[in-house]
From Swiss-Prot:
The keyword Transport does not apply. It is found in: Nucleus. Keywords: Cell cycle, Cell division, Mitosis, Nucleus, Repeat, TPR repeat, Ubl conjugation pathway. The lineage of its organism: Eukaryota, Viridiplantae, Streptophyta, Embryophyta, Tracheophyta. It comes from Arabidopsis thaliana. TPR repeats lie at residues 237-270, 272-304, 339-372, 374-406, 408-440, 442-476, 477-510, 518-551. The gene is APC8. This is Anaphase-promoting complex subunit 8.
């Protein structure tokens, strides 16, 4: 593996280069990784140890997970020093400094105009980047002015055509560098030319691998493992960060966790890696672990807002109202106009059953970021709770437009159409959700219920779905109970008995009671009595005697029947049974 000192030197140089080009998000990400590198003990000072307190407990606790393979071998990492673009060797010109000042003040067109006669690659990048952001700014203004229901509008970035033309010409002549290639890839992606966009972004990260923004854009274009594997990427430690993120988005969570475990060998105190690990654990539904990790993350970085929306989802799922209330109050005081903050507050109101207020905050999040996927999906859920299915469908469709591989939005569409009594449509959307997440029992159960509706009534298909749900570890036990009932309905009593016994074993192991247990005990007692397996039947009847009311009377009736079947005479005395 590349040395820590080598990584540290590369990142320090990259932060300066990224900041010089106003790529502030990439510079911030790089800075977070810089302080995430474990310091040499000989260099410990109060200044450089402050960022590395407290994280080690989580790192030790979760760096080795049973589901993770052994750390990846240290193969082929580039250890060359950061190449210094030629323009960085000289002092920036006066015009560039003024243009950068305009850019920092969000006067993008003014910055672009100031650089109109500059020919250096650095100046060309900032000129066209400023023009791109000027177009984005105007697009956002038009979206507010022209928006229709749920914020729909036809606003576009009107600079994309000229940007594509100019950047394409500059690329052909070799007049742009890796940063220009990154911008060219972004423009091509916006125009829907994904293949060329990937090629441009790959060229960019291969020539300058420290621009996290370029890696992020490339990851968003890797919608399948086949596309990811087809990329011709140079070996570099930044590639490992990219693959960890890409695997996570492709729902390859074990592989993603393995990458992050490997990277922790150098970036031992990286809050980013800890947050990404928590995301993967969340997808694996390890909510208790995720909660601990986010609590530790907030202790180390108390004013952090990014990724806290995921933490709020965990607290929502665990119905931890007090903790969610505290988190919502905290982010409100920190930065209430961040999309993540609005989403967290929306989750809080949703948990309290105040769905109108929740929708208001999800809408506010979308005002701040129209492409905020979670807000569209969560708003759809709220509309489902409010029985406003047309609005729910609209919200879910917006989520699908942003990310066609988001299983939650497809699942939401299925639920909405199911509520409207349109099982054929619901089935289509449930199938789409299962395509993107085939190992989730909840999706198979939803599709099975669709097959059970009166309009479809395809019980054999429902049985297949419930069997898949059982294989996907149905923690709620819905599938086993339904399999037993469906086989009973179809007159397959042997199969029904098998699944009732399995369900009973599950409930006993979990210490559960309730109607499902009573139903299973009655069926099994009756089934074994009818098959003259009286000892087994008595066992289930005896368990039924522990109930009170109608259940106990049912048990007595069954025991009388068993006694009569055994002796051939009516039983007049049940005192020998533990009633």
């Amino acid at each position: 593996m590349v040395s820590k000192e080598c990584c540290r030197n590369e990142i320090r140089a990259a932060i300066r280069q990224l900041s010089d080009r106003c790529l502030y998000s990439a510079a911030k990400w790089a800075g977070e990784q810089l302080v995430g590198i474990e310091q040499d003990p000989s260099n410990f000072t109060p200044a450089n140890t402050r960022f590395q307190r407290g994280s080690s407990s989580i790192r030790r606790r979760f760096s080795t997970n049973e589901s993770i393979s052994t750390p990846l071998p240290s193969v082929g990492f580039s250890q060359a020093a950061t190449p210094l673009p030629e323009e960085d060797e000289a002092i920036d010109g006066d015009i560039y400094l003024l243009a950068k000042s305009y850019f920092d003040c969000r006067e993008y067109r003014r910055a672009s105009h100031m650089l109109r006669d500059q020919v250096s690659k650095k100046s060309l990048f900032l000129r066209y980047y400023a023009l791109y952001l000027a177009g984005e700014k105007r697009k956002e203004e038009e979206m507010i002015e022209l928006e229709g229901p749920l914020g729909k509008s036809d606003a576009i970035n009107r600079e994309l055509v000229s940007l594509e033309r100019d950047l394409s010409a500059l690329r052909r002549t070799g007049a742009i560098d890796s940063f220009g290639l990154y911008l060219y890839g972004v423009v091509l992606k916006e125009k829907g030319n994904e293949s060329l966009a990937r090629a441009s972004l790959v060229e960019s990260v291969n020539s300058y691998p420290w621009n996290w923004s370029a890696w992020s854009e490339l990851q968003s274009l890797c919608t399948s493992i086949e596309i990811l594997n087809s990329l011709n990427l140079n070996n570099h430690w930044m590639k490992e960060f990219f693959l960890g993120n890409a695997y996570q988005e492709l729902r390859m969570h074990t592989e993603s966790l393995a990458k992050y475990e490997y990277l922790q060998g150098i970036f031992s105190f990286s809050n980013y890696i800890q947050a990404q690990t928590a995301k993967a654990q969340y997808s694996l539904r390890e909510f208790d672990q995720v909660e601990i990790m986010f609590e530790e993350l907030l202790r180390n970085d108390p004013y952090r807002v990014e990724d806290m929306d995921l933490y709020s989802n965990v607290l929502y799922a665990k119905e931890a109202c007090a903790a969610l209330s505290y988190l919502a109050h905290k982010v409100f005081l920190t930065d209430k106009y961040r999309p993540e903050s609005c989403c967290i507050i929306g989750n809080y109101y949703s948990l309290k059953g105040q769905h109108e207020k929740a929708v208001m905050y999800f809408r506010r999040a979308l005002k701040l970021n129209k492409k905020y996927l979670s807000a569209w999906t969560l708003m759809g859920h709220e509309y489902v709770e409010m029985k406003n299915t047309p609005a729910a469908i609209d919200a879910y469709r917006r989520a699908v437009d942003i990310n066609p591989t988001d299983y939650r939005a497809w699942y939401g569409l299925g639920q909405a159409y199911e509520m409207m009594g349109m099982p054929f449509y619901a089935l289509h959307y449930f199938r789409k959700s299962i395509f993107f997440l085939p190992n989730d029992s909840r999706l198979w159960i939803a599709m099975a219920k669709c097959y059970q509706t009166e309009q479809l009534y395809m019980l054999e298909e429902a049985i297949k779905c419930y069997k898949r749900a059982v294989n996907c570890t149905d923690t709620e036990g819905i599938a086993l109970n339904q399999l037993a009932k469906l086989h009973q309905k179809l007159g397959r009593n042997e199969e029904a008995a098998y699944y009732f016994e399995k369900d009973l074993e599950r409930m006993d192991a979990e210490g559960l009671e309730g109607p499902n247990m009573f139903e299973a005990l009655v069926f099994l007692a009756t089934h074994f009595k009818n098959h003259k397996k009286f000892e087994e039947a008595e066992v289930y009847c005896t368990r039924l005697l522990d109930y009170s009311g109608p259940e106990k009377e049912k048990a007595k009736s069954l025991l009388r029947g068993i006694r009569m079947a055994q002796t051939g005479f009516p039983s007049m005395d049940l005192e020998h049974f533990p009633i």
